[in-house]
Amino acid sequence: MAIVKLRAPLRDLAGGSREVSIDGSSVGEVLQELERQHPRIEGWVLDEHGRVRRHVNVFVNGERVREDAAVASDATVHVLPSISGGER
């Protein structure tokens, strides 16, 4: 199983889990399973077509990837939502 590492706010939506173990052969499958296991995350990472949202960066073993990238069973997947703010 791949290890999926979560940052805020996703960590909060996953009940405070910093990392979860998830099966899947592609990034898309892993993220769909993440949403299935943690329904509060649904809509934050994947859009209605199953694609990674533009404001979310996904890295597999340190390489930025999209939803069709392969995921080995020993991979580490980082899911990083972009952080933005308003004017000062």
Where on the chain are the PLM-derived regions?
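Ubiquitin-like/PB1-type beta-grasp interaction modules and other compact soluble beta-rich domains
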Residues: 1-88
